[in-house]
């Protein structure tokens, strides 16, 4: 697979992680390098590992995964997005609010945004190509875009305050819905 094609694949797969990083940046109160790094590492590592998992499982697991992957992503993003919107309206202690730095939340977000990368790995297994370069580039591109996305999101979050939490939650729900709809309406 050519470098240009792999880069384009990486950019396409990183789009959801970038959008979720923006949403995460919206709600982070005091931005620090290590906070953005944690989010970027979760997304980058998952985006790098999922194509490898997809590639290794190949065709035997492909049919099962393609039947449920969109539902998993949709449910995770719908739940997290709804929680963000709920918390924007409800008066809560800071300890109870949506925390994009919570390890379990990050794990759910990383899985939800990397399911497409798993499917891409399944597709790459059909090409009988090496998986090392695609995994590395996909992970690096996602890491960089996610890292930048947290800072951009934080900048806008500090300007718009609570409204941005609602926008962030809606963004997650829209991404989840997009994943679900695209998989449900694709030709058989």
UniProtKB/Swiss-Prot annotation:
Give one Pfam family, short name only. Answer: Mntp
Membrane topology term reads: Multi-pass membrane protein
Protein task: Probably functions as a manganese efflux pump.
Q: Which HAMAP family match?
A: MntP_pump
Q: Which family does it belong to?
A: Belongs to the MntP (TC 9.B.29) family.
Per UniProt, what is the name of the gene that codes for the protein in this document?
Answer: mntP
Which UniProt key words apply to this protein? Cell inner membrane, Cell membrane, Ion transport, Manganese, Membrane, Transmembrane, Transmembrane helix, Transport
Q: Which GO terms describe its cellular component?
A: plasma membrane
InterPro entries reported in the protein's UniProt record: Mntp/YtaF, Put_MntP
- Regions that span the bilayer: 8-28, 39-59, 68-88, 106-126, 131-151, 164-184
The protein's name is Putative manganese efflux pump MntP
Name the domain of life: Bacteria
Q: Does the keyword Hydrolase apply?
A: no
Q: Where does the record place it?
A: Cell inner membrane
Q: Name one GO molecular function term.
A: manganese ion transmembrane transporter activity
Q: Would I find Transmembrane among this entry's keywords?
A: yes
């Amino acid at each position: 697979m050519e470098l240009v094609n792999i880069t384009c694949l990486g950019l396409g797969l990183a789009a959801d992680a970038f959008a979720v990083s923006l949403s995460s940046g919206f709600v982070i109160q005091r931005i620090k390098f290590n906070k953005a790094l944690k989010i970027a590492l979760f997304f980058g590592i998952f985006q790098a590992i999922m194509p490898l998992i997809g590639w290794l499982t190949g065709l035997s697991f492909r049919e099962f995964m393609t039947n449920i992957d969109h539902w998993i992503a949709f449910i995770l993003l719908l739940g997290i997005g709804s929680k963000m919107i709920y918390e924007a309206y409800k008066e809560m202690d800071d300890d109870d609010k949506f925390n994009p730095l919570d390890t379990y939340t990050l794990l759910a977000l990383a899985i939800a945004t990397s399911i497409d990368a798993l499917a891409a790995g399944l597709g790459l297994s059909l090409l009988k190509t090496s998986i090392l370069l695609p995994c590395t580039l996909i992970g690096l591109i996602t890491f960089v875009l996610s890292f930048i996305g947290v800072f951009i999101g934080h900048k806008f979050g500090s300007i718009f305050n609570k409204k941005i939490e609602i926008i962030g939650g809606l963004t997650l729900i829209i991404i989840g819905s997009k994943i679900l709809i695209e998989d449900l309406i694709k030709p058989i």
